[in-house]
Amino acid sequence: MKVLNLGSKKQASFYVACELYKEMAFNQHCKLGLATGGTMTDLYEQLVKLLNKNQLNVDNVSTFNLDEYVGLTASHPQSYHYYMDDMLFKQYPYFNRKNIHIPNGDADDMNAEASKYNDVLEQQGQRDIQILGIGENGHIGFNEPGTPFDSVTHIVDLTESTIKANSRYFKNEDDVPKQAISMGLANILQAKRIILLAFGEKKRAAITHLLNQEISVDVPATLLHKHPNVEIYLDDEACPKNVAKIHVDEMD
């Protein structure tokens, strides 16, 4: 596991955007696992700049989002469908829509939708890169504490802490969906390479638990210790004291 403090959200996001761009440039049929939320805004902003500057052919790139709120239509401003369109797919409108995969949070039968999305993940094979954030309680995707390590795509009852943390995106806390559909932990670990981003003081405790705690369902992110190729990029505020700062120009 590689852990790097790049000083700021902007610097870390730029570095990871370059990693995604290189993957798409050198592997035109690559498969990317994508994440959403406030952590990822600078990442997509930087990636869009790189794509527009170089007019990269992404017609054969496939994307797979981690999760979606249950009960929100794709057109809802707080849905992750809307987020991805707003942050990436409308900003660089050359991705092939048939290769964009995001769980449907408004399906009539959500358990069937979870099974369907899991089938897509299995049929498409390993993602080349999986992008992750981390929740204040150590969740990855929407896999809350207590989620079995062998879980696959499933419907999640969101914890009070997650609902509270996400309420800043809604008019009030009561508007936050109480469930989500999420890739399971086993799905996440199937990726060839995992890149986790964490920014801000509120994420420091979760990162500290991830780095120092034994693998436990109480902190789902600790499962990443079982994966052979994990990179964690932090800013100063999220970084535990024992991780030294490094500048992007010092990296290979």
Swiss-Prot record:
Hydrolase found in the keyword field: yes
EC number of the protein: 3.5.99.6
UniProt keywords, alphabetically: Carbohydrate metabolism, Hydrolase
Gene Ontology MF terms in the entry: glucosamine-6-phosphate deaminase activity; identical protein binding
Active site: 67 (proton acceptor), 137 (for ring-opening step), 139 (proton acceptor), 144 (for ring-opening step)
Protein's UniProt keywords contain Hydrolase: yes
InterPro entries, alphabetized: Glc/Gal-6P_isomerase, Glucosamine6P_isomerase, Glucosamine6P_isomerase_CS, NagB/RpiA_transferase-like
A Pfam match: Glucosamine_iso
Pathway(s) served: Amino-sugar metabolism; N-acetylneuraminate degradation; D-fructose 6-phosphate from N-acetylneuraminate: step 5/5
Its biological purpose: Catalyzes the reversible isomerization-deamination of glucosamine 6-phosphate (GlcN6P) to form fructose 6-phosphate (Fru6P) and ammonium ion.
Similarity comment: Belongs to the glucosamine/galactosamine-6-phosphate isomerase family. NagB subfamily.
UniProt name for this protein: Glucosamine-6-phosphate deaminase
Organism per entry: Staphylococcus aureus (strain NCTC 8325 / PS 47)
